[in-house]
């Protein structure tokens, strides 16, 4: 994410909320939050989203196009086969798509969306949070710095506090 980017985040669960917070911390000009749950969209606003789109009734592709020719970066964090295909239609020519959500079903990609990769010369990237090589990796250094300084606020994700012994019941 570069200063001034326009970013779309599809799926506003924990991964999406953090993607929104990081986008704003890195200087995104406008962040679109896309979800089917109004409560999650309100959380997305608290994490810095500028435009909230409930895709239950609105085509998020058409809605984003009202603001220009597409975003610089589209992040798929829902892990939904439907959105995994549709996210390819959000970036402008030369834009990026990052897949962070993990689908638990096959992802059929209609020809229109698959062609967006070639016709728009998209950069498609997968992201997986794990330890990098060589051990110890440095991927958490920035996270600790940004969270510790308050540039990225994670406290909004805390909705309940329970005793450790109650943990198994929560799941």
Model-derived segments and their meaning:
Residues 51-56, 159-166:
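Short acidic-hydrophobic, aromatic-tinged amphipathic segments that line or gate anion-handling sites
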Residues 77-85:
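Beta-loop-alpha module in the N-terminal Rossmann-like domain of NAD(P)-dependent dehydrogenases
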Residues 107-160, 168-169:
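C-terminal substrate-binding/catalytic core of Rossmann-like NAD(P)-dependent dehydrogenases/reductases
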Residues 63-74:
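A short acidic, Gly/Pro-enriched loop at the edge of an enzyme's catalytic core
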Residues 5, 95-96, 122:
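Glycine-centered, small-residue-biased loops immediately flanking beta-strands
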Residues 100-101:
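Acidic carboxylate diad motif detector
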Residues 91-93:
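Helix-to-beta-strand junctions that scaffold the AdoMet/dcAdoMet cofactor pocket
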Residues 1-57, 62:
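Mid-domain Rossmann-like dinucleotide-binding core that forms the NAD(H)/NADP(H) cofactor-binding site
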């Amino acid at each position: 994410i570069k200063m001034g980017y326009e970013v779309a985040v599809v799926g506003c669960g924990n991964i999406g909320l953090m993607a929104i917070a990081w986008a704003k911390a890195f200087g995104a000009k406008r962040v679109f939050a896309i979800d089917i749950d109004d409560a999650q969209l309100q959380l997305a606003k608290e994490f810095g989203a500028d435009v909230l789109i409930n895709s239950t009734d609105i085509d998020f592709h058409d809605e984003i196009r009202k603001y220009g020719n597409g975003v610089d970066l589209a992040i798929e964090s829902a892990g939904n086969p439907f959105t995994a295909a549709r996210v390819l239609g959000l970036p402008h020519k030369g834009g990026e798509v990052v897949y962070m959500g993990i689908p638990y079903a096959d992802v059929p990609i209609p020809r229109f969306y698959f062609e967006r990769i070639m016709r728009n010369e998209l950069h498609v990237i997968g992201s997986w949070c794990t330890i990098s090589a060589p051990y110890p990796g440095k991927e958490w250094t920035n996270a600790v710095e940004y969270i510790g300084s308050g540039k990225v606020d994670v406290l909004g994700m805390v909705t309940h506090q329970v005793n450790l012994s109650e943990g198994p019941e929560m799941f």
